[in-house]
Every structure is written in C-alpha cells, then in structure tokens.
C-alpha cells in the first residue's frame, strides 16, 4: 500500500498518518510511505491540529492500493482528508515524490 501527499496547498504544514494502530509519521508535500500489509480491511487516518479524517480500505492478496492524504482549508489550522485513488494517479504522484521517513 502506498500512502502519499502531493499538493503544494498547505505546504508549510505536515499531517500525521496512521494505519490502524500503526503510526507511520508525518507527510509533507510530495512525500509518500510504502507499507507491506496482509489482506484485510485497514483504517487509514490523517490528523492535523484541528481535525482528523479516516477511511476503511480493503486489500486483497496481491493488490497494490494508493491512498492520498490531502490538506484542506480549516478554521484556524488546516484539516486533512484521506481517500483512495486510481492506480495511475497514485503511481504518477509516487514517482515524482520522495519517500517519507517512517517512525519506528
């Protein structure tokens, strides 16, 4: 599974990203994480100081999924959103981005 952020909107802010109980770390603009996962349903969550958003993504054996995390306009601080995207869109964003440092 690839989780990425590509927009320059809100570039001064990073957003925290987690998959289930696993905290991956922060995504800045044009960065991505790649994680190996077992087939099942995963709760993907992004968090900013003002809000959070989550989506459930089901992954079958052998599938590669792409999930975009995006900054959205907030009242005082930015908000975030996560959503699955088509493989073509996800691959093109990952190719031009940089791998983010995952928290261990």
Segments from the language model and where they lie:
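Short loop/turn and low-complexity linker motifs enriched in small/turn-promoting residues
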Residues: 1-104
């Amino acid at each position: 599974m690839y989780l990425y952020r590509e927009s320059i909107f809100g570039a001064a802010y990073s957003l925290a990203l987690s998959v289930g109980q696993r905290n991956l770390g922060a995504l800045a603009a044009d960065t991505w994480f790649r994680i190996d996962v077992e087939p099942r349903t995963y709760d993907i969550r992004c968090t900013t100081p003002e809000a959070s958003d989550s989506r459930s993504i089901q992954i079958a054996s052998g599938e590669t999924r792409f999930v975009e995390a995006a900054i959205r306009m907030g009242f005082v601080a930015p908000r975030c959103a996560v959503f699955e995207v088509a493989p073509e869109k996800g691959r093109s964003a990952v190719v031009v981005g940089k791998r983010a440092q995952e928290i261990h």
